[in-house]
Every structure is written in structure tokens, then in C-alpha cells.
């Protein structure tokens, strides 16, 4: 019995839409199922075999398919391993260990081992950024560089929008669309972004997101990051105070490349080329 979907039928519907999106992956790719201690982990591999390796992690409710709008840019110069996280939609095991535990760092160790990568750069967005940060702090020797896009765990979490989202849930499809519009907060959307947005709406019709609070990394911990870091924040993010996050990261890591887009929300556009350039010379 599924632990992350409201019904088994709903889980099947999400996976069918997921597979349909993967069929439209814009670059050559290879699906992989990796063995880890938590269970099977699904990944989509793209990009030149000899390019710098990058493990890409999406946020809550996200899958490898959510990289669809940016994968062509990233995979032009990087070997991208787009990994479905445990307990999230997609085709990875549904286990959800506590976020504050070492379980996710151990899981990512297993992912790297299964891919035969002693180390790799990490790219994470939202909760995926939290997992990338957690791994970088626990296993610095395995993280060559860190690229973050509106990561969780640095800036303060905004509570008021969560209350609105809870209210919108009572209004079915209209409520889900209203919630997604709030999160997008005016971010420009091309055809692929709209397609991924529709998939997100369909996912949250059936998916039960984590209710656990995401642990916050204090400045003192962020100061321990020893690898090159690039971070992109949207000042209009309704979920996280990313202006606060950018200030904290600049305080902790004066040499980091920290960018704050004043007119962008949680779905941050236009970061992929900068990340590809940043990670392109690292392995």
C-alpha cells in the first residue's frame, strides 16, 4: 500500500503522466534504477559521458521530469544525473526517514557508489537544495561544488502562505491552481514550464507531501562549506524568505556566488546557463 499517495489509483495516474513527460525528454538520455540501502532509486542520465558529473535533486512534489525546461542547457556541458528522491513522486522508494537524520546523506552515498562516482557536483532546488546542503556538510569530500536554486533550509519559512494553501485545498482543482499561481508569483512560463506546471497540479491531486518542518542551517554551519558555491534566490518567493537566505549565505561564505533576483518567486527562471557555466569546470 502506498504511503505517499491518497490512493493506489492516484499513484498510478501520477506515474503514467511522469512517464509521458520523460518520453518527451529533449536530449539523449538513459533511465537507471540504482540499488541503495533505502531501496531502489530512479535516475535519468543525460549529457556527455566525459563531462563533469552533477547530481540534480528536485524539491517536494518534484521528480526528474521537473528538470525538463532546463535539461538541454545543463546537459550540453554536464553529465547530469537527475535523481528522484525517496518519499517523493516518481519511481524511487517511498521511504521518508526524518530530515534531521543522517539517512539522506547515506542514501546519496549509495547513489554515488551505484553510479561509480567518488565525488560529484550537486544541484538542488527547494527541498532538493536542502538535501544537497546536508550532503555537502556531512560528506564534503564527495561534493565537488554546490549549485542551489531557491534552496530550503537557509531563509526563514513563511507561515501565512501555508495557511492559505491549507484553505485552498478545500476547493479542489481551483484551489490547487490558485496555490500554484501563488508559488509561481508571476514567473514567466514557456511551453515546457506550463507542461511541468500541469504535471505538478495533477501530482498534488493525489500526492501527500511531507508535513515535517525542514531543519534550518545556521550561519555557523554554512560557514563550514568548503566547496565552491553558487546560489540563486528569488526575492518574491512566497514559501521562503530568500532575501534573508541570500544575506545569510553571503555572511557565511563571502566568496560564494550569490544572486538575488528581485522580480522572481519560488519558480526561478533563467538560472540554468549560469549554473552550467559554474559547474562546467568542476568534477
Question: What is the meaning of each model-derived region?
Answer:
Residues 1-53, 77-78, 118, 279-283:
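Alpha/beta-hydrolase fold catalytic core
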Residues 42-90:
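Conserved HGGG/HGGXW glycine-rich cap/lid loop of the alpha/beta-hydrolase fold
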Residues 58-60, 120, 124-129:
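Conserved alpha/beta-hydrolase "nucleophile elbow" surrounding the catalytic nucleophile
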Residues 81-123:
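Active-site loop/oxyanion-hole signature of alpha/beta-hydrolase fold enzymes
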Residues 130-138, 143-173:
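Flexible "cap/lid" loop of the alpha/beta hydrolase fold
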Residues 157-159, 171-227:
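Conserved alpha/beta-hydrolase catalytic His-Asp/Glu region
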Residues 209-251, 260:
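Conserved serine/cysteine hydrolase catalytic core
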Residues 255-283:
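Catalytic active-site module of serine/aspartate enzymes centered on a nucleophile-bearing elbow/loop
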Amino acid at each position: 500500500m502506498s504511503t505517499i499517495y491518497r490512493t493506489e489509483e492516484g499513484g498510478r495516474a501520477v506515474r503514467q503522466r511522469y512517464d509521458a513527460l520523460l518520453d518527451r525528454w529533449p536530449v539523449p538520455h538513459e533511465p537507471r534504477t540504482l540499488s541503495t540501502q533505502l531501496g531502489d532509486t530512479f535516475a535519468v542520465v543525460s549529457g556527455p559521458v566525459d563531462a563533469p558529473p552533477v547530481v540534480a535533486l528536485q524539491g517536494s512534489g518534484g521528480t526528474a521530469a521537473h528538470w525538463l525546461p532546463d535539461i538541454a542547457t545543463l546537459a550540453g556541458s554536464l553529465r547530469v544525473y537527475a535523481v528522484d528522491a525517496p518519499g517523493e513522486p516518481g519511481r524511487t522508494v517511498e521511504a521518508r526517514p526524518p530530515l534531521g537524520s543522517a539517512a539522506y546523506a547515506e542514501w546519496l552515498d549509495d547513489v554515488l557508489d551505484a553510479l561509480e562516482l567518488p565525488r560529484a557536483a550537486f544541484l538542488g532546488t527547494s527541498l532538493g537544495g536542502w538535501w544537497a546542503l546536508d550532503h555537502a556538510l556531512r560528506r564534503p569530500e564527495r561534493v565537488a561544488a554546490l549549485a542551489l536554486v531557491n534552496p530550503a533550509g537557509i531563509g526563514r519559512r513563511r507561515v501565512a502562505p501555508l495557511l492559505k494553501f491549507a484553505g485552498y485545498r478545500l476547493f479542489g482543482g481551483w484551489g490547487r491552481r490558485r496555490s500554484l499561481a501563488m508559488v509561481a508569483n508571476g514567473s514567466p512560463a514557456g511551453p515546457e514550464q506550463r507542461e511541468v506546471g500541469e504535471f505538478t497540479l495533477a501530482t498534488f491531486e493525489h500526492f501527500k507531501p511531507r508535513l515535517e518542518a525542514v531543519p534550518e542551517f545556521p550561519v555557523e554551519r554554512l560557514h563550514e562549506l568548503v566547496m565552491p558555491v553558487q546560489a540563486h534566490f528569488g526575492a518574491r518567493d512566497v514559501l521562503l524568505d530568500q532575501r534573508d537566505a541570500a544575506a545569510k549565505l553571503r555572511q557565511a561564505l563571502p566568496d560564494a556566488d550569490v544572486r538575488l533576483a528581485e522580480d522572481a518567486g519560488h519558480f526561478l527562471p533563467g538560472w540554468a546557463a549560469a549554473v552550467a557555466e559554474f559547474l562546467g569546470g568542476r568534477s
